[in-house]
């Protein structure tokens, strides 16, 4: 335990805050060719370098669609592609947000559907906002 004099001289140092989506907190300065740590962004744009499927941890079983994305801050991350079916391939430009996938280790980001090169989920009726799906055509009203 430190003495009062030691605390006066040095003081307490607070532990560094750990971020759940660290890639969103870095920005790239192209003039100085440096990456700087900042307040963070809600989303970041990136280019897909690889699109593939992977299997989840036990006890789950599936083929989850993921993409390796090189972000505008020159970092490369693994992002999950939500929804059924997608049109992504290498060199597709995507927008990512934070948010992990609990049964996929190392996947801390989600791709936002319905923006840039990512199409929304087709024929989705409920929870459309999360999947970039447009409102379906309403049935014509019957006349009496």
UniProtKB/Swiss-Prot annotation:
GO MF, one annotated term:
structural constituent of ribosome
Does this entry carry the keyword RNA-binding?
yes
Which is one Gene Ontology cellular component term of this protein? small ribosomal subunit
Q: Which residues carry this modification: 3-methylthioaspartic acid?
A: 103
**Pfam families in UniProt:** Ribosom_S12_S23 (PF00164)
Which keywords does the record carry? Methylation, Ribonucleoprotein, Ribosomal protein, RNA-binding, rRNA-binding, tRNA-binding
Looking up InterPro entries in the UniProt record yields: NA-bd_OB-fold, Ribosomal_uS12, Ribosomal_uS12_bac
Q: Which segments carry the region annotation Disordered? A: 125-144
UniProt biased composition (Basic residues): 131-144
Function as written in the Swiss-Prot or TrEMBL entry? With S4 and S5 plays an important role in translational accuracy.
Please describe the quaternary structure of this protein.
Part of the 30S ribosomal subunit. Contacts proteins S8 and S17. May interact with IF1 in the 30S initiation complex.
In the record, the note on similarity to other proteins reads: Belongs to the universal ribosomal protein uS12 family.
Q: What is this protein called?
A: Small ribosomal subunit protein uS12
Origin species: Dehalococcoides mccartyi (strain ATCC BAA-2100 / JCM 16839 / KCTC 5957 / BAV1)
Q: What is the lineage of its organism?
A: Bacteria, Bacillati, Chloroflexota, Dehalococcoidia, Dehalococcoidales
UniProt lists the gene as: rpsL
């Amino acid at each position: 335990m430190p003495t009062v004099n030691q605390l006066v001289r040095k003081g307490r140092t607070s532990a560094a805050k750990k971020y759940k989506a660290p890639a969103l907190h870095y920005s790239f300065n192209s003039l100085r060719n440096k990456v700087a740590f900042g307040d963070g962004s809600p989303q970041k744009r990136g280019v897909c370098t690889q699109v593939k499927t992977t299997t989840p941890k036990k006890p789950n079983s599936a083929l989850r669609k993921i993409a390796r994305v090189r972000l505008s801050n020159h970092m490369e991350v693994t992002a999950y592609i939500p929804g059924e079916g997608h049109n992504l391939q290498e060199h597709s430009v995507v927008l990512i947000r934070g948010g992990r996938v609990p049964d996929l280790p190392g996947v801390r980001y989600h791709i936002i559907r319905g923006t840039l090169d990512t199409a929304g989920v087709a024929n989705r009726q409920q929870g459309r906002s999360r999947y970039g799906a447009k409102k379906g055509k309403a049935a014509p009203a019957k006349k009496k």
